[in-house]
Amino acid sequence: MTTLHVYKSLPQWALYRKMLQLIPTCFLLALVLGCAGSQGIPKELSAAGPILVWPLPPEDPRIQYVSSVASPEDLGISKGFFRKVFEFFFGKTEERIQQPYGVTADSDGRIYIADSALRVVHVFDMPEQKYWSIRGTNREEFQFPLGVTLDRERRLYVSDAERQAVIGFDRGGNAFATITEGLQRPAGLAFNATNNLLYVVDVIRHEVLVYDLKGKLMFTFGGRGAEQARLNFPTNIAIDREGRVYISDAMNFRVQIFQSDGTFISNFGRLGDAVGDLARPKGIGIDSDGHIYLVEGLYDVVNIFDRDGQLLLTFGSAGVGRGEFWLATGIFVDAKDRIYVADSYNSRVQIFQYLHNGR
């Protein structure tokens, strides 16, 4: 496993003392919404402007800003002739991201973004240079989409917190399954390639529910509490290449790690205002070297930890510019170690690259 340099000097940590100006009134909404070019970066995602990396020189760079996505035009996707004709007669469709939460991507560069404000999943298809959106099933539209994940066949699964369901879609955007058994408030979800099961975090049940791909509930783990292996309003989930499960345990202010069968391994984190403390943990992701990426919603940064909970690096800051966040939520790290961060109140997804050995 490649070792990241520990970030010894973290400038601008005065932001750790700031408070969010917008405080959501709904408790559940607060939990989920916060109420040098390197090899492997596609040409279409290469950054414009000065190179932005973390940590700053003279340290070797480990994270590089790549791009920002707010609309199809940001990725060079232009409207086709028939789309223009359709909009001429029927009006323009909403294609600009408004309030992203969950994000995922496949190895070919298709990006899927759950937009809870527009109640859609945006699909940016880079290989085909196309954009479309999924609004739900033929029988019922999304009410509050949050989590997105893909299985090994690249079928899409979307959690809808209001519908108390997870809906499966084929690659053409057609619904093929609706999972409801046991669900009360599904949020984050992830597919485990080691056992071909779908893991769903339920905020209200304080549990992780595990299903086969036919929608059968196989087992659950967690349950409300502060003891190890217990959860308190969990929100997000990630699964590494070995099948280990990582949970953002929001109101216990920690990350918990489990085996694929729900057996507890370890946890780390605490509430506080020191560097690396977890005041409002949100999205979580894992890179190919096993580093844990955790969105810190209160301070508008992404913290990177090793599996023992040692803080290795922090990137981002509060703001609206490149590499800055305003109430970031979800995060996803793909097989090429591209990092996608749902920058919720900036209405965009920012893309970064993990640089192995500083390049």
Q: What are the roles of these predicted feature ranges?
A:
Residues 1-18:
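N-terminal secretory signal peptides that target proteins for export/translocation
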Residues 1-2, 24, 193:
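Intrinsically disordered/low-complexity terminal segments and short unstructured peptides
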Residues 21-22, 258:
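General helical structural elements
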Residues 23-32:
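Bacterial N-terminal signal peptides
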Residues 35-359:
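Eukaryotic scaffold repeat domains enriched in small/polar residues
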